[in-house]
Amino acid sequence: RGSNGVVMVTTKRGQEGRATVSYNGYYGWQTVSKKIDMLNAYEYADLVNDARNNTYTDKMESINRKLIAQNKNPLSFDISDSNAIRLQNTSNDYNTIVPVEILPYLRGEKGLVDTDWQDEIFRTAGMQSHSVSVSGGSPKIRYYASVDYLSQEGVIINSDFTRYSSRFNLDVTEGIFKFGLSLNPSVTIENAVNSDGAYNKDGGGIIASALHSAPIFPVYNADGSFCFAQNAWSPNTQTTLEDGSVKKGNSQTQVWNPVALALLQKDETKASRIFGNVYGEVAFMPELKYRANFGIDIYNSSQDTFRPSTIPVANTEGNPESEPEATAKTAKMYNWLFEQTMTYNKDIKGHSISALAGWTMQYQRDESTYAFANGFITNNVPTLNAGTVTRGDSHASEWALLSGLARVQYNYKGKYMVTGALRADGASRFGKDNRWGWFPSVSAGESFMKSLTFIDDLKLRASYGLTGNFRIPNYGAQGEVAYYSYVLGGNSADVVKGAAPKSMPNPELHWEKTAQVNLGFDASLFKNRLTLGLDLYNSNTYDLLLDVPVPMMTGYQTRLENIGKVNNKGVEFNIATNQKMGDFNWSVYFNISKNINEVKELGPGNADIISSGS
């Protein structure tokens, strides 16, 4: 636990005094900082014309080389040849003809379609945030409450994010008792678009589609419907040749109209989350306190997508309507943490002793469902019950952690400091005989040279600690069973569903551990105008949790194992200065570090571990 550091989060709490009401808000705009420079319609037509002429020239030169090799006369050709002659010379190679749709642009006609597809999908997106809070209290009761609203449009059309949240904190003190609670509920609504996908699959990525769309095609047809002329086999962009024959298709890259992709598809995610925390504290005596803390984190989300029939089938003659598709996904997470600690603090003639002992329990359960439906008879009802659900899935998993901890700190007049700590963690993810890990740590520091006038503080420190990592799948040690469909017998329709092992168990799996030594010093000079810090560290991680390839005869590809050693060592140095000149303050901070990472051991013979996926 804590092998990658610990983040401490402190929320706003009420202060003693009269009630204070405050408001904070802003309104702003966001835009794409830089668009990609693209050709306009006339430049695009010139480029396509050059490309087709080059293709025609290369094709004819290849044909003539073969004719000469056969002692035959070469064919005469020129880039001014008509499409009919090009087809005759190349035996109907349609890649050599000049698309009819670009001819008006080559002639320089005015007032033709010239679409900037980036301008069509991007926008100046507004965003606003508002927060109202009230806080106050008495010596016995302090409170803080706030209500927040955030609305943010996406820079791509038809995308936005909205969040409603609130926070309530209460602290009550009565004699030797202290009580408090925190509550932070929030609701978010997100309308997303496929901004990162490829232009010709996966629903059509909006940005990629815009960058692949030719500027000679409009966003809308004359009747106001979306133009899908660049969906390669569209009949309204048939190429008519000089002899009257027709080549179906527009000779351009197949791509859906990106504006239609953004506006017609639905991808809405609604989520709610509640962070809650309640604590109680009893001071049995000034030096001895007991504290219990219980926190919860509850998360629920639902995602609904719908792709209407008005987005045509890709690369198909006539732009026929596609079959509508919809998905529904849900996710639930429930996490609770219960902590109990006893602390003792005592000062005796410059000797300060602080001790802590505690016990914690944590549990989390995750659930998810997925359903896919098609066969919708209308685009007006995008819910799954209006179609036919053809596949679905659901998952549930849980994990738990028990921990015991103890810490003792000694301080003598702020000059000598020693800390020792020990924690034991038991994780459900490991085998029943290997769930517990023990993690001790010790540190010491000394402040000296305060007698020198230019030195405000100089502290040397050293520490050693052992931390653990249990971030593996919840059932990584046990192995999982999955359901599969299998064809039995000679009749392919005889599909039988059964269960089979999915992952290879490893009951010997245990904690990955990291032992780290730190040496360093901190200095403050010239009345705290200059501060320095230096850290040297050496970290050894062993029993790494890795997926290791296993022989194929086992029926598995990999097994989770404790294997290998990794060393990290390095240095960090920082220097800062804080200067005040009257009412003017300025500061400078500089930091530099170097880390050396070395894989010391990786299984028998240090063989490489090669795996796919994430």
Regions found by a protein language model. Name each.
Residues 11-12, 523:
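Active-site beta-strand termini and strand-to-loop segments that position acidic
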Residues 163, 169-177, 182-187, 243-307, ...:
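Extracellular/periplasmic, surface-exposed regions of secreted and cell-surface proteins
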Residues 7-9, 573:
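Non-catalytic regulatory/gating segments with a bias toward low-complexity or hydrophobic composition
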Residues 6, 20-22, 142, 354, ...:
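A residue-level signal for beta-strand positions that form part of recognition/binding surfaces
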Residues 1, 12, 30-35, 508:
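N-terminal plug
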Residues 1-7, 14-20:
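Flexible, glycine/serine/threonine-rich loop segments and coil->beta-strand junctions
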Residues 15-157, 195-197, 218-267, 280-283:
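Residues embedded in well-ordered regular secondary structure
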Residues 32, 107-148, 152-159, 167-248, ...:
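Flexible loop and strand-edge segments within Gram-negative outer membrane beta-barrel domains
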